[in-house]
Amino acid sequence: MIDGLFVIDAVAHAYNHLPENWADPVLGDAMVELAYALAADPPDPKYALGRDVYLSNWQVPDVANLLFRESDTDVAVMHPLAISSFIDGYSSVAKAAEAISKYPSRFIGAYACVDPLKGDEAIRSLEEQVDLLKPMGLKLYPTSWDGTKPVSWRMDDPKLIYPLYERAAKLGLKHVAVHKAVPIGPFAVGDAYNPSDLENAATDFPHLSFEIVHGGLAFLEETAWLLARFGNIYINMEIQNIIVERRPRTFAQILLGLCKVGGTGMLDRLFWGSGGTLHHPQPGLEAFAKFEFPEDLLDNSGLFMPMRQISRENKANMLSGTFARLHGIDIEACKRAIAGDEFSRPAGAPLPKPYSTISMAGQVEEWQRERA
């Protein structure tokens, strides 16, 4: 908990950045370099990581230590990444299964993730993951690799994507997370990262909820109109944890932009996500806990109504309440389940030094010593 508020991290990854995992060297290299660039040079150097450690094959116990021992994150949800430019996925289904099996009270669930380009094989993979993971939802990306080149698509494609929504619903899944806004490589993607294609999806599948992962980092106005118009569209704030730490005024502009059409109530359709090992989870939480909208931005925000200051209730919803309601999670039961476990700290005890509890702690310490 941070500032007395329970924290659910809605998306954690155990990345395998290693070249041995690249099916396509161009796209693989582009994606890992994008990830490292996002996390490089944090304001507080104690959260910096050298390339050798960052661009490694992260193991589940290290992800758990980062989230639950070294940060104020209480529980998390693991997302595998079925992007075919990586041989075993960028974050494998096996790691998601390991996380929820080894730490069930902390990794309270996982999403299934499939590559739509695989057609019937994607359907079979979804069915297998439903058996293995009992997933909370389905995660989709708008780009993958067809064996020769990157291919992108829209999330309202009736032949490629709608069969996945239909099968997910038949399998009991009610939630679909869609990566948007942040292209994953230096190649043409058309409008695949524009969330406007969710207009048709949200209309045609009103019984499903859609979370726009990275919503607001691009196509801000389009996203704001979607939030205002569709009650089954939400925002997963992954990467915004980095922005609130480093560029709080930009973070404020993003949140206010998302609320521009629908008003401050749209804040309660956003929920926290860090990406797990994308960047250390603690500094973003600390920055968000003390965050307020600059008054000059408030004075110039809102299309149809004035915006009010972010409240403690808004923060509680963004950190856990909204996601918990969406998925039927009992927060009090979660608190009881983690009380006194291996990650618990005595009241008032400080957090461990960043990266000191992971298996690569010695490498981190040596790199930071050389860098100083």
Name each model-derived stretch.
Residues 1-10, 17-66, 124, 264-269, ...:
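Mid-to-C-terminal alpha-helical segments outside catalytic/metal-binding sites
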Residues 11, 96, 100, 129, ...:
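Conserved, mostly hydrophobic/aromatic
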Residues 11-17, 179, 214:
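Histidine-centered divalent metal-coordination motifs
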Residues 18-24, 90, 123-125, 150-153, ...:
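Short aromatic-enriched loop/helix-cap "lid" or pocket-rim segments at secondary-structure transitions
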Residues 53-80, 133:
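Catalytic domains of carbohydrate-active enzymes, especially glycoside hydrolases
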Residues 58-65, 94-97, 122-126, 195-198, ...:
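Alpha-helical scaffolding within the catalytic cores
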Residues 75-184, 189-191:
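Active-site gating/metal-coordination segments in enzymes
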Residues 136, 144, 150-272, 276-279, ...:
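Catalytic pocket-lining loop regions of alpha/beta-barrel enzymes
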